[in-house]
Amino acid sequence: MSDWILSIEGTPAGHTAAMILALTAALLHAIFGSLQKGRIDPWLSRGAIDSAQVLLALPLALFLVPWPEGHEWLLVLGALPIHFCYKVGMALAYSRGAFTVVYPIVRGMGPVFTVIGAYLVFGETFSLTQWLGVLALMTGIFGLAVYNLKTIKVDRDTLVPALWLAAGTGGLVAVYTTYDAFAIRGTPNPFTFLAWFFVVASVDMPIVAALRWRRMTDRPPLARLVRLGVTGAIIAFGSFGSVMLATRLDKVGEAAVLRETSTVFAALIGWLVLRETVGPRRIALMSLIAVGAVIVELGG
């Protein structure tokens, strides 16, 4: 598999594969986000997911992929503090604000800063047409957040800090996307970085969750946390793994923009699975997000 990934890197086939991977990551990330903002405390849910990630990824890292060498260990370890800050930001935002408001803002902040980061780190550039696509996509995402903000009835007393936390966490999305792209490109075998990333960058939140668990009086059933953790870990492998491979194969900025169509998938999940009302305005905003992504993809 790694030989095939390396063989199509920087080719038209690689571009197509990167597009498919980024869209797959978008769908899976929407599902992943809804799991963390479920009925279980977001700190516990993230801890359960990360615990499962360590247990599932460790055998792969130890026995199925080449071990990191020299500077590759530094690349893997460098992801830990960045992703820890991101996960803390997400948990803080989710514990204070509604998912339908927090999630679009976090994802909406990422694309423009990632495109700038990709320019500074990798020398990537966007055409004027692609920037117009980014503008359309971000307008749709933030429009969706504003619409949800006006209609929600829960968590309104803590909404302002939730919005600030969501905006800051969105900036961290750009930081970790750029860093992960740099790291996976600096590792000869991309699956070496992926396997060890899911081990090393997942050891922190289980500790935080365990400390929180000890202080709780109304604890959720352990079996429920285990099911959530395993399900979330498998989805995370597909989501984060797909977008990282996409940034290895093609432009980081384009992969980041396509991934943010996850807000469309999140709204569709709410409509089809949770039976939430969509309405013409949300349909128009989701269409704008999709159109923006198409413009970015075709305008390069």
What are these regions (language model features)?
Residues L21, L28, A52, I82-C85, ...:
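Hydrophobic residues within membrane-embedded alpha-helical segments of Major Facilitator Superfamily
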Residues Q53, A91, Y103-G110, T169, ...:
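Structural signature of transmembrane alpha-helices in multi-pass secondary transporters
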Residues I82-H83, S95-L144, T192-V200, V252-L272:
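Specific alpha-helical transmembrane segments that line the substrate/conduction pathway
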Residues T178, S242-R259:
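Alpha-helical transmembrane segments and their membrane-interface junctions
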Residues M1-D3, A57, V115-Y119, T129-N148, ...:
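Hydrophobic transmembrane alpha-helices of multi-pass small-molecule transport proteins
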Residues L159-R185, N189-T192:
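Selected transmembrane alpha-helices and immediately adjacent juxtamembrane segments
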